[in-house]
Amino acid sequence: ALPAGEVYIAVAKAFLARGAKNFLFETLSSDAGVLDAVSYLKKCVPDAFVIVSFAVLPDGYTREGLLCRDLARQMAESGLVDAVGLNCVSAPGAMRPLARQLMHIGLPLSVMPNAGYPVVARTQVKYQGKPEYFAREQAKLAAEGVKILGGCCGTTPTHIAALRAELDALPAQTAAEPVPLSTPEKPDVEKDDAFLRKLNAGEKVIAIELDSPKDADLT
């Protein structure tokens, strides 16, 4: 397989041939090959505007186990990327605290969450997050200084129209102070845990799986 950077550059060439000047690298789980491609774009079009956006779980990690804080910092320190962001995977309420923790990196921030979380209804995947919830959570980020807002999976023109209405109603505000990103602590497997003791002793244990909430609005 070709290195990721070469794949990105091959695709970029097709867009450059059509006169593209704005580029969005999105739903990324790592930075593999990204900066190689961005460097190529900047050499071809020095005033190109490039956004790099990562898909992050609510705990702040990508599916490859990389922390969004570290990825965003690498993009900022490269001096090549014009804006960094988060998109997909998480709903607005879960993405908002992650976005707030990235406001200190020194680049404009892009936030494009899913409408909510997917559910399967009659073999069809649907997102039950309501436009009002999506717009309300996104507008909070705008009030705190996020410059680029949008939507990913499950968002519709109705979601975007609701967001536009919320943004139009916002008064001018001062950006909030950035929140430091803390690294989740690893569990201490040595501590006294009744469940673990029973497993180690070969005793019968009972585990219950709970369905996820039916609505992504946890407020």
Model-derived regions: residue spans:
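Domain-level signal for soluble alpha/beta catalytic cores
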Residues: 1-219
